[in-house]
Amino acid sequence: MCNINYHMVWSVKYRRKILKPEIEEYLQELVQQIAEDKGFTVHLFECSEGDHIHCFVSAPPKLSITAIVKYLKGITGRKLFERFPEIRNQLWKGELWNHSYYVETVGSVSEENIRRYIEHQSKSY
């Protein structure tokens, strides 16, 4: 079995600081439920400075990172607006999250180790 590890970051639209403790707690529960339903694992989830999210997940290769982000941002946005309608006053156009996000793969092998391995392979033949 194979999993790919990702570090993701995304922010609230207009960087509004709406991620208060009550919202953060509900968001944490939502993210874990989404992961369980969709087949990936959330290792770490943090709301930072009230306006952005850091999330560390593992997923099988059949589940693309774009799908994971779509699930997380789409479902949480809809559910947060339902549960906390007052946050709409600070946001408009019905969008909770910025469209963009940052993602990187995370592994235990450095670029230098990969480079050495590949260079060594070409000299073996």
Show where each model-derived region lies.
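Basic nucleic-acid-binding interfaces
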Residues: 1-125
